[in-house]
Amino acid sequence: MPVERFLLDASVAVEWFLPGGGPGARYAESVLERVSAGELVPSVPDLWHYEIASVLIAAKRDKRISAKKLRSSQVSIRGLQLETLAIELNAADLVDLSQRYHLQGYDTVYFETARRLAIPIASIDGGIKTACRVFGVKLL
């Protein structure tokens, strides 16, 4: 089976690291299983690292995860073998694209990266999923 490259939205990865099993937990787990099996290769915009770190730090501070869970999440992230992508988007262009796609700025970075590279995106975010349908970007 060929390996498929895809863009990993933080909304999916957050489900891997935080307890509670939100509405996208089953989907997120299926993505992780395919990554672990070597079927999928995750790519992320550089923004992903900042978002995930921020979520994990806040979860630890708010006592939603323990120090042990924080450390195990760090080990898991290092083991993902992520391909980090950088696309050029200045703030003015990001505002224009966000308005065009009806997305928040952060979500636009994920969506625009997948669109430019013509790779599918794994996301739980409703706005990103809608933009994918409207603008022809493949959802994983």
Where on the chain are the PLM-derived regions?
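Acidic, PIN/NYN-like endoribonuclease modules and their adjacent C-terminal/linker elements
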Residues: 1-5, 34, 111-140
